């Protein structure tokens, strides 16, 4: 199993590989064979360690996603256009109905300063993180609403 310190935890770089002693020994051998490795990685380790100290903050990101999900769920105007899915993470997935144009939706959001990701033709992903403020959440809700009406 791998664990990334930069995803959601906010460290600028770093991952951890987890496994049995035998597995880690084998992974180190492959790393040497492939020429991987870095020197003086203490500064990276310190940033990863700091991100672990702040790990409870990720719950705030989950709450941001839940807040936007609740907003979407309360609006009947979205029925027939897309359905939101939230699974207790910092992400919301918008599943678009047949005939609804997810790519235009993304373009309209982007024009308004809201970035999202196209997973496939019918699914858009919204990700919430430490740099999304309360004011940003209000902006995101407004732009999701107005972009869905176009």
Where are these regions (language model features)?
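Active-site C-terminal subdomain of aminotransferase-like
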Residues: 1-91, 96-97
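Conserved C-terminal alpha-helix-loop-beta "cap" of PLP-dependent enzymes
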Residues: 77-146
